[in-house]
């Protein structure tokens, strides 16, 4: 983030605009809308700026800039085409810690003006940091179309009743749930239709209803990595959560979608580190839910595929806590799609089997004859550490050493890496694979080179000379 978006109260503050042509006029108008005291320095005033001066909405200080005019100024905008003057103004403002914007020169700006969607008191500001003004304009048009013109009236009425609601509901959670319920009710529609009296009646009626503080636990599948693969329902739940317990595999892009004031707790497990136990995770879920919180358990992929999600909602059920499950795109499905490897194919595979590498030990996973069937694609979650063992078992039970394999690291993300090789050479390949990774075994991997569409790095391009049987790459 190159710029921190903040909203500044300019009411009655002295600001200085240097230049009073068309560009300067646009900045003056914005500053006047923010109720700032606008002072102008310009050799000439355009006709519309002259009207503002006549109506005493601005103050014309001088035709020429002087350092004395920076005294007691909160913010400066320079809208001139004088490069030397702009450089001088920028330097002197920085020396005085005065906010300055040199129009159309973002390297000489301590702040920039965003594109504004005004539904006062509701304000939406967006910016591309000066990199893509046309894209910014298109986004503004889309947002303008989404937000009704009278949406500001909704905020105004809510503001007038805010203190009364605070007195009526002393508990913060009660207040938040009241407002959430109200804004999802016909209250908003009444205001947008101009029926403010009916809207107030709805508000009063909701005030007299009991607010339930019953907590709940929601399992949410975050998908395989790309934040665009999070479901719409998953996004809605993250925006409503009070507490989010998340795995370390969940990407930062998805974590950024969580409601800003929600409590976030990482409960992920990592090899070689001291980890929170599953029992401790369950205790945390129940603890927060029993306090009336909406608790989200955010898990990579899908919560019911090797995710112990069932154990967590069993505990919720036993504790009498309401729960729900929001499925996610499981890693095998998402990553295979992003690497151009169809898990089933009429020519290569009649089915697919999912297993986890953590349980590949004799006595627990003992159906190797089925797993070795070449007519099935085998997908191994968390298989890096046991990859050599798995390959040996599959070969022992009849799978060809030339069976193609793909190891995918950080699948569906911009850091996705793909290693393609043969089952018999996995011992040479696996050192180049980071953990965690997904292992796909089967003839469908033949299609990777042809069908790969998402840009990723093929690690073996760098080390291909070490292998003898990579003819299918």
Swiss-Prot record:
The active site is at residues 247, 269. CDD domains: SUMT (cd11642). InterPro entries: 4pyrrol_Mease (IPR000878), 4pyrrol_Methylase_sf (IPR035996), 4pyrrole_Mease_sub1 (IPR014777), 4pyrrole_Mease_sub2 (IPR014776), CobA/CysG_C (IPR006366), NAD(P)-bd_dom_sf (IPR036291), Siro_Cobalamin_biosynth (IPR050161), Sirohaem_synt_dimer_dom_sf (IPR037115). Keywords: Cobalamin biosynthesis, Lyase, Methyltransferase, Multifunctional enzyme, NAD, Oxidoreductase, Phosphoprotein, Porphyrin biosynthesis, S-adenosyl-L-methionine, Transferase. NAD(+) binds at residues 22-23, 43-44. Residues 1-203 are annotated as: Precorrin-2 dehydrogenase /sirohydrochlorin ferrochelatase. GO terms for molecular function: NAD binding; precorrin-2 dehydrogenase activity; sirohydrochlorin ferrochelatase activity; uroporphyrin-III C-methyltransferase activity. The modification Phosphoserine is found at residue 128. Its EC number is 2.1.1.107, 1.3.1.76, 4.99.1.4. SUPFAM superfamilies: NAD(P)-binding Rossmann-fold domains (SSF51735), Siroheme synthase middle domains-like (SSF75615), Tetrapyrrole methylase (SSF53790). Signal peptide: none annotated. Residues 215-473 are annotated as: Uroporphyrinogen-III C-methyltransferase. One of its GO terms (biological process) is methylation. PANTHER family: SIROHEME SYNTHASE (PTHR45790:SF1), SIROHEME SYNTHASE-RELATED (PTHR45790). In the N-terminal section; belongs to the precorrin-2 dehydrogenase / sirohydrochlorin ferrochelatase family. This is Siroheme synthase. It comes from Buchnera aphidicola subsp. Acyrthosiphon pisum (strain APS) (Acyrthosiphon pisum symbiotic bacterium). The gene is cysG.
